[in-house]
C-alpha cells in the first residue's frame, strides 16, 4: 500500500470516529428522553384554622400646642402614662415598642383666591406611635379602654394573630399532600394507569391571614363602646398551604 492510500484511510477513519463521538451524546439524550417514565403532576391544597391567642395593637398619642417644645412635653407625658398603665396591666417590656415621633407645624391658610398670601403657623402637633402585643385576649378591651382614658387619641388598628402557628401550618401541609395524592389517584384511575412513586414535591405556602380590624372600624368601636368596654370578637385565622407533587405512572 502506497503512502497516499495510507493517508486516505487514516483520514477516513478519523472522520468516522469524530462523527461517532458527536453522535453518541445526541443518541444518549434521545434514548434518555424516550425511556423517561410518564408522569402526573398535581397541586394539593390544605387549610387549617385556629383561634387567635394574641392581639397586636397599633396606637398613637397626638398632642398640639403653641410651640413644638410644649407639644413634645405634653406628648411625652401622655405616652409615659400609657406605658405605665400597660405594664401595670401585665404587658411585658418585650411586648411594648414605640415607633417614630412625628412633629408637624399647624398651618392656617388665608382666604385668598389668588394664593398670594402665605399661610401662618399657629402651633405644632407631635404624635408618637406605640405597638402593643397583648397575649391575654381577655384583657384587650380593658387595655384599650385604659389607653384611651390616659391619652391615646389616634389610631390605629388591631390584628388578632397566633403567636406560634407552626403546628397548625404543619397540619395544613399534611392535608395539602393528602389532597394531592387523592387528586393524582383520581386522574390515574380515569386514565386507566397505575400511580407510581413521588418523584418531586414542592411547597407553595401563603402567609397566614390574621383577623384584622380596619382602622375606621377600630375607631368606631372605641367611640361607641358602652360602659367603658370595647367588645372584641376573636374569630379564627386561616392557614393555607399548596404543594406541587409529581408522580410516576406505572
UniProtKB/Swiss-Prot annotation:
Localization, UniProt: Periplasm
Residues spanning the membrane: none
Range of residues in the leader sequence: 1-28
Domain of life: Bacteria
Main location group: periplasm
Sorted UniProt keywords: Periplasm, Signal
Statement: the UniProt record of this protein carries the keyword Signal: yes
BP GO terms, sorted: DNA damage response
GO cellular component: periplasmic space
InterPro entries: 26kDa_periplasmic_antigen, SIMPL/DUF541
Pfam families to which the protein is assigned, alphabetical: SIMPL (PF04402)
Protein name (Swiss-Prot/TrEMBL): 26 kDa periplasmic immunogenic protein
Organism: Brucella abortus (strain S19)
Amino acid at each position: 500500500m502506497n503512502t497516499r492510500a495510507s493517508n486516505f484511510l487514516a483520514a477516513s477513519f478519523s472522520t468516522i470516529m469524530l462523527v461517532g463521538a458527536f453522535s453518541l451524546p445526541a443518541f444518549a439524550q434521545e434514548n434518555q428522553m424516550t425511556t423517561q417514565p410518564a408522569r402526573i403532576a398535581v397541586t394539593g391544597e390544605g387549610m387549617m384554622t385556629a383561634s387567635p391567642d394574641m392581639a397586636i395593637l397599633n396606637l398613637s398619642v397626638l398632642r398640639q400646642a403653641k410651640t413644638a417644645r410644649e407639644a413634645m412635653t405634653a406628648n411625652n407625658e401622655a405616652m409615659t402614662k400609657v406605658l405605665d398603665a400597660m405594664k401595670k396591666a401585665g404587658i411585658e417590656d418585650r411586648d411594648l415598642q414605640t415607633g417614630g415621633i412625628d412633629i408637624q407645624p399647624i398651618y392656617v391658610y388665608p382666604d385668598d383666591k389668588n394664593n398670594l398670601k402665605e399661610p401662618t403657623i399657629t402651633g405644632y402637633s407631635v404624635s408618637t406611635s406605640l405597638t402593643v402585643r397583648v397575649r391575654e385576649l381577655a384583657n384587650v378591651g380593658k387595655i384599650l379602654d385604659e389607653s384611651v382614658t390616659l391619652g391615646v387619641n389616634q389610631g390605629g388598628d388591631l390584628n388578632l394573630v397566633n403567636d406560634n402557628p407552626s403546628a397548625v401550618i404543619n397540619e395544613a401541609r399534611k392535608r395539602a399532600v393528602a389532597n394531592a395524592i387523592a387528586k393524582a389517584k383520581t386522574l390515574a384511575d380515569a386514565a386507566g394507569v397505575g400511580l407510581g412513586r413521588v418523584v418531586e414535591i414542592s411547597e407553595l405556602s401563603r402567609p397566614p391571614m390574621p383577623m384584622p380590624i380596619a382602622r375606621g372600624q377600630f375607631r368606631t368601636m372605641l367611640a361607641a363602646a358602652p360602659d367603658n368596654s370595647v367588645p372584641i370578637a376573636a374569630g379564627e385565622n386561616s392557614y393555607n398551604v399548596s404543594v406541587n407533587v409529581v408522580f410516576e405512572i406505572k
